Amino acid sequence: MLKKPKRKPGRRTYGKSLKIFIPGTLFVHARKGFGFVSPDNPEEYPFDIFVPARDLRGALDGDHVIVSVLPYPRDGQKLKGTISEVLARGKTTLVGTITSLVSPTSALAYTSMSGSQSLIPVELLPGRTYKIGDRILLSTPPWVDKPQEGASPALQMLEFIGHITNAKADFQAIQAEYNLAEEFPPEVIEEASLFSQKHITQVLHSRKDLRDLLCFTIDSSTARDFDDAISLTYDHNNNYILGVHIADVSHYVTPHSHLDKEAAKRCNSTYFPGKVIPMLPSALSDNLCSLKPNVDRLAVSVFMTFTKSGHLSDYQIFRSVIRSKYRMTYDEVDNIIEKKHSHPLSKILNEMATLSKKFSDIREERGCIRFVLPSVTMSLDNLQEPVALIENHQTFSHKLIEEFMLKANEVVAYHISHQGVSLPFRSHEPPNDENLLAFQELAKNMGFDITFTPTQEPDYQYLLQTTSAGHPLEQVLHSQFVRSMKTASYSTENKGHYGLKLDYYTHFTSPIRRYIDLIVHRLLFNPLSIDQTHLEIIVRACSTKERVSAKAENSFENLKKTRFINKFLQEQPKTTYHAYIITANHEGLSFVVTEFCHEGFIAAAELPKEYSLKKNALPESIPDKMKPGASIKVTIDSVNLLTQKIVWSIATTTEDKPKKIKKTPSKKKGTKKRAS
């Protein structure tokens, strides 16, 4: 239950300083300790507020807080704030790792959610012998405005999770850390079981029968929930008619049902290597809603007519029943398009490839940037230990599906908006000038020139294209540009989509795994089913839960990656690794280790003397070997699994070259996160 804030949101004057008090949700960086507050009212405060670790004041990741901000930072500093009050804890439990034992019933533990490297006193449950490295579930402490001098109160242990050396317990720890429920309540399972294949037959008369239409799915080889199928036909003028057929989840998950309430609570599915926490029970997600081949399935079909040049001329949206003819994988489609294999779909797939290329060219013409970001798939053994990092590559089949889904999302957003109905847009606002200037400076220091468009705007599209297709700094530069941009989110206000350069955009194509898409389906056919106030609540909840799931997925990957790097330290302690510098300043050196797709940092005090920099060193005074993009060699000094801290150092002598640590880079194992 929310408590009444002691400090009301708004402006307050303290001496000569005007402070703004803004309510929002706190997100704490699990490894670096700082946080960001996402304001409750993004229309009034359309930015996240940076909070240094020292200014969290006992606030934890996920807390609903009030942050105080000085609106006019001094000396060009970034806008940052201090937590003034915690209105409500975001979690009732924390996960801690014992780092030292004080007595048989008390210990000190590390928890990443506090945003601090300091250790927390813990009162242990009796009846067990504990060891350093034990992971335990703890009760969240109440927030105290002005904590008393002296030691922090001990947190109560609730449950034993497992020792840090037990990789099988990683999932349970992350699940508890982010409060992700895997099991569904009995009433939800029971409600899902009421539907069967017979139910589809009973509603055929009320739908467009498309069971004879040649349509099929394209997904990863491991996918089980097939949201979308595609088709391609032609009209009498030989214009393209692209069909995108999406599982009609809204037919089964009706407003205020048990299924609906649980889906609204989860907001989305969360994906881990070899495992998923679904938004819907498997009876729906893997069965009745999944567009499996050669079975009747209920769908929402979007038929879009495109001219020979690839421009939209007409569209239709209606409920249908389809029967997918093939379940294709990305690899199969790539082989067919590259003419390595013959297949009954060869002709239509090549025609789809032609249309997809037209869409891609149009996107490029309007200034849309296609990013190449570092991404790996983690391969785990039966003990859940990482055995390989497999580099992902987006192939043509991925781009084909991406282009088709983007078109469907755009058309649906345009359609609902022009019906005069409020909807959840997928918004992506332009970066602020400060971040863009910082990126321009970074690119310049890496040796790149920023050209300008005819309207005298910096041509980031051209810059990033010149670093694509295997450029050694491709992933570094693209990653830094993405970081300069704002995070995409949901909003009932249409702010456009900067990354896609679209005026209308929403999420419609993945209702099995995203609650927003389910809401959009409802608005298509029953626009009065959701009032504005309720829609605003849904939009905020889905934006927040999306970030929570992303953090959980990243935390799991980082933990496994730490295990993987530790394995190489134990087996190859003298190995040097190739890295590229990201930033260099008086605080230290940050870099990306390409072999592990991992960002590291070496504090200034630990750097060789020739790598030291003065506090206000000008970019032109930085030696070439320390400039962003410069190549360096690093070694692993130590790995602390308890805190997931990896200590690196500059390689000063010729060391062993790294042995092969990856399998042959694979084609991207399809991800469910298709649309931006």
From Swiss-Prot:
InterPro entries: CSD, NA-bd_OB-fold, RNase_B_OB_dom, RNase_II/R, RNase_II/R_CS, RNase_II/RNase_R, RNase_R, RNR_Ribonuclease. It is found in: Cytoplasm. Keywords: Cytoplasm, Exonuclease, Hydrolase, Nuclease, RNA-binding. GO terms for molecular function: exoribonuclease II activity; RNA binding. Its main location: cytoplasm. Residues 659-676 have a biased composition (Basic residues). Residues 656-676 are annotated as: Disordered. Its EC number is 3.1.13.1. It comes from Chlamydia pneumoniae. One of its GO terms (biological process) is mRNA catabolic process. This is Ribonuclease R. It catalyses: Exonucleolytic cleavage in the 3'- to 5'-direction to yield nucleoside 5'-phosphates. Residues 566-651 form the S1 motif domain. Residues 207-527 form the RNB domain. HAMAP family: RNase_R. 3'-5' exoribonuclease that releases 5'-nucleoside monophosphates and is involved in maturation of structured RNAs. Belongs to the RNR ribonuclease family. RNase R subfamily. One of its GO terms (cellular component) is cytosol. The keyword RNA-binding applies.
